Amino acid sequence: MASPALISETEAWKDLKSHLEGIKKTHLRELMGDTERCQSMMVEFDNIFLDYSRQQASPDTISKLYKLADEAHLKQKIDRMYNGDHINSTENRSVLHVALRASRNSAISSDGKNVVPDVWNVLDKIKDFSDRARNGSWVGATGKELKDVIAVGIGGSFLGPLFVHTALQTDPEASKNARGRELRFLANVDPIDVARNISGLNPETTLVVVVSKTFTTAETMLNARTLREWISSALGPSAVAKHMVAVSTNLPLVEKFGIDPNNAFAFWDWVGGRYSVCSAVGVLPLSLQYGFAVVEKFLQGAHSIDQHFSSAPFEKNIPVLLGLLSVWNVSFLGYPARAILPYSQALEKLAPHIQQVSMESNGKGVSIDGLPLPFESGEIDFGEPGTNGQHSFYQLIHQGRVIPCDFIGVVKSQQPVYLKGEVVNNHDELMSNFFAQPDALAYGKTPEQLKKENVSEHLIPHKTFTGNRPSLSILLPTLDAYRIGQLLAIYEHRVAVQGFVWGINSFDQWGVELGKSLATQVRKQLHASRVKGEPVEEGFNFSTKTLLTRYLEATSDVPADPSTLLPNI
């Protein structure tokens, strides 16, 4: 008998639907009272501790989710990814970001070729170049050391590396290696972003890394041309070859741009942008800032989770458990969002990165076979470090919409502070909130409890917390390069699990194309209006025509053929 075309047509899905009503009637207060249940919902790998006992789920729920995974052929799909099968079917590509952090002696194939040697050729090239840039044997056009780096890219070429950079900045080993150096990321085509990035920097000591696989990405290449002008206007056109390098596979365009093709670092079609932080996209700028040895530890951390994900049984497999719980929360309990709440300021850029990884991967309305999905899939991801988020949006999480939460804590702070006479140290104060918030969400506070506290009758409705709000807790032992790599890989694989179960293609992103193609039409109109004085006429609806006309009239002082003007800040 043929497999159902949609996962929602399977017996396991229908069984979970039937099971749902009983779970909805059971409060987390009751579920949390079962010690045996709680103990069964705790998993540890390599000192990473996952507690998902505060999910609206019983052991029976979890068993049924395993059956759903089996009917979705989850293990086979994971194996197909690792084997280099073209699981990105709409673009006919392998999905092999795991190869980017594989050990040198590994064998991972795409189209019959072991890609690991190519990966390590690029890593060795990055190590050599970053070592030379850091020790002063590669210098700028005027002989000065290149201590400042601007990485130019957008989307996955920016969010992932920025997350890792921000997390490493306060790590003792990494920060020591980065002393006297600066790494910035230019992503937005907004000239304000250019101004902020070059502010306070000297072209003589700045190296620009242009990240674009095809070297045609509109925003990235305009920003790259802007920085090329910034360098050449200060140091002369010949300086570009000393101050700009590329992460790209289009060597002819790299050379035409003025960058020496020998200073281009490759990556491959089997690397999706949002999964590219472990390629030259992230490894090159991060190695220039922190040294290759630190970044290699980051890669090793990601690799450790890759091995865990591919080999651990589902009951002990952290990414699989997280992915299945997300499917349960989204498609069965009907919760559309997820809050990512790291209790570490070093992880402040985790949520924006995972927002892209998750929402660009799983924000799909059709199955991998093109069938409309009759169920909800994908999550709205957002987050903020604790305790800042508590003073921002936790109000809604506690007393408004139900939003499942990921609490991420770190046992040992990167930068401990101790003050004599304080009741607890700064990190203990932070972690007090990490431990308290999940219970507040789960248990809530009843009107009866408030009455016992002599709360005024008219305030009781306002101070009541319904509880029964699901969360999970991840406790990391430390936050060094290795653990940052592990955390990244956990979330990458969690997202893949969700997509595999939902039966969607988590590795394409056709949704970004339509807006870009329409922007081409607008760009042509802006050029025609500025240069030829043509009014906004054909091809636009009334609303867009009105907005465009208003914009052009208000910026009529912009010259048709302006002289070069760079930000002055």
From Swiss-Prot:
Active-site residues?
Answer: 360, 391, 516
Reactions that this protein is recorded to catalyse: alpha-D-glucose 6-phosphate = beta-D-fructose 6-phosphate
Localization annotation:
Cytoplasm
Please give one Gene Ontology molecular function term for this protein. Answer: glucose-6-phosphate isomerase activity
- Which InterPro entries does this chain map to? G6P_Isomerase, G6P_Isomerase_C, Phosphoglucose_isomerase_CS, SIS_dom_sf, SIS_PGI_1, SIS_PGI_2
Entry GO CC: cytosol
Keywords tagged on the record: Cytoplasm, Gluconeogenesis, Glycolysis, Isomerase
* Keyword match Ribosomal protein: no
Gene3D superfamilies in alphabetical order: 1.10.1390.10, Glucose-6-phosphate isomerase like protein, domain 1 (3.40.50.10490)
Write out the GO biological process terms. gluconeogenesis; glucose 6-phosphate metabolic process; glycolytic process
Q: How does it assemble?
A: Homodimer.
Q: What is this protein called?
A: Glucose-6-phosphate isomerase, cytosolic 1
Question: Whose protein is this, by species?
Answer: Clarkia concinna
Origin organism lineage: Eukaryota, Viridiplantae, Streptophyta, Embryophyta, Tracheophyta
* Gene for this chain: PGIC1
